[in-house]
Amino acid sequence: MAEGKKIGNTLLPSESMKVISESVGISQMSEETCQLLAQEVSFRIKEVTQDALKFMHVGKRQKLTPSDIDAALKLKNVEPIYGFHPKEFLPFRYASGGGRELHFYEEKETDLSDIISTPLPRVPLDVSLKAHWLSIEGVQPAIPENPPPVPKEQQKTEATEPLKVAKPGQEEGLPGKGQGSGEGKGKEKKTAILEGAPLKLKPRSIHELSVEQQLYYKEITEACVGSCEAKRAEALQSIATDPGLYQMLPRFSTFISEGVRVNVVQNNLALLIYLMRMVKALMDNPTLYLEKYLHELIPAVMTCIVSRQLCLRPDVDNHWALRDFAARLIAQICKNFSTTTNNIQSRITKTFTKTWVDDRTPWTTRYGSIAGLAELGPDVVKTLIVPRLTVEGERLRSVLDGPVISNIDKIGADHVQSLLLKHSAPVLVKLRSPPDSPDAYRADYGYLGPTLCTHVLKARAQSALQGPQVNRTTLTVTQPRPTLTLSQPSGSLTPSPRTPSIIKVPSSLTLPVQTLMSARPATPTQPSPPPTKYIVVSSAGSSGTQVLTTSSGPSPSTPGVQPIVKLVSGGQSSGVGGSMTGTGGGMQKYIVVSLPPAGESKTPQPSPPPPTTETSTL
């Protein structure tokens, strides 16, 4: 949402392009064409305006005139716009008399009778003293006595358009506003400077922090670079969420910049990581607008990416993680603050590319440059990294397959190769169509071709596996330990004398509980498995025990299955749906069949007698 507002403030709306095109007879223009045309027109207008401002400054004027615009258009070999040159300067009126020429502001005449007849204002209230809380547990209460926090939109306006936030009398007091007196003062100043008089400069105004803010700044900075991880986490959380850090933002920016400058010289990897985490916390704070401080933050982050050495032992310490983290930070900065006016992303991309293509660049700096380019998006990888895979592969071959010159160079080459394969494979999956052969990749990309082909094949396989899973219903089956309890309904069974059994016979039949949880209410595409059968064999032997055999098929995949209990006797038996007759002397089988709903007509087949290997004695 914030990015949309930012782009809307710097570009002409696409609706204007449609209206202009319709006025010249072009009625059908796509939205994409209008947006591209709006970007181009905005860029040209800004370019002409900047050139006109240069002519204004050369002419030592404080206001932009149509002649400056005409001069800028002539500089671009464009015909100037005619008919907008006034005969007199509009804010001033001209008068002459007594041999003098005067230019003055036209003021409205005020009648004294109107002033006399105006009723007097109300008498102000008497002076009184009132106490209020400045802060409660570190949080400023929202009361009329306390100043409201500076909103992020105002910070952005102050950073991009400082003239809009100037006080009403401040702009008028600037030198050179009046024509009559400005020329004389300008000549006097030039004469005084030429004679060697000291040049008077406007003193800088330094904003002073309160005692509480100074204490907070001291505690936060010490905790962020200290040895206690718990305090560091709390400090970073405070920086990322506190809405009252606007006044301390210049101090934090300077602290990070100076800290990186000192610790890079001392090769202190830990403190550099802590400082980059501070940058991440500042960027995560939604109430801070960092554009006015990018001139200090961007060099600090870029130093952690492309510096030659960040630690004392480059072959052991993991400085590669710091370079990756800083590369992600610089990509986020480009995403949030790059516009067609400042061109932050294009300038950073040019810096990374210039460092990477240099043959004298060490492997650590080369790794950082590639990581920074890769984090800027797949378009940058496609345009800048993929065309140089052949050249970079030959450089890697000379280090990895050649004589070992330095262990540090070999480790750096390994990391560069892994980084190139990691970021190039997803892009090549979209650029190249299958089949992928190592010979074709070797011909196109040289030394990295076969390994790159392997990574592309893995990426295609992963995308093929992940593709069907998007529309596939996920079934999670939770099946606790099965418990079978036998019951004898009254009136359905003929009582018979039974021997004592160790199986307890309650008054209900409990089947295994199966819970099906689906990611969305849809019918699974897999075919339904066959019905589940539970066979319970009960026999009365001389030992006074019963044999219980359970044979289970695949668990049902659809809810709503109604079980049917069928009892079969060893001698003669007849029973359907729970009714049966039998004698106590023969062998009995309890068959529990789980069938699908009534809509599907399937006749379950009786299960064969269970094998002896599945018989367990309870």
UniProtKB/Swiss-Prot annotation:
Gene3D superfamilies: Histone, subunit A, TAF6, C-terminal HEAT repeat domain
Annotated Gly residues bias: 572-587
InterPro entries tied to this protein: ARM-type_fold, Histone-fold, TAF6, TAF6_C, TAF6_C_sf, TAF_TATA-bd_Histone-like_dom
Any one Gene Ontology cellular component term annotated for this protein: MLL1 complex
GO MF annotation terms: protein heterodimerization activity; RNA polymerase II general transcription initiation factor activity; transcription coactivator activity
Gene that produces this protein: taf6
Record note on quaternary structure: Component of the TFIID basal transcription factor complex, composed of TATA-box-binding protein tbp, and a number of TBP-associated factors (TAFs). Component of the TBP-free TAFII-histone acetylase complex (TFTC-HAT).
Protein name: Transcription initiation factor TFIID subunit 6
Tissue: Expressed in all tissues examined, including heart, liver, lung, kidney, spleen, ovary and testis.
Family of this protein: Belongs to the TAF6 family.
Compositionally biased tracts (Polar residues): 476-496
First-listed, main subcellular location of the protein, grouped into a coarse class: nucleus
Role according to the record: The TFIID basal transcription factor complex plays a major role in the initiation of RNA polymerase II (Pol II)-dependent transcription. TFIID recognizes and binds promoters with or without a TATA box via its subunit tbp, a TATA-box-binding protein, and promotes assembly of the pre-initiation complex (PIC). The TFIID complex consists of tbp and TBP-associated factors (TAFs).
Pfam families: TAF (PF02969), TAF6_C (PF07571)
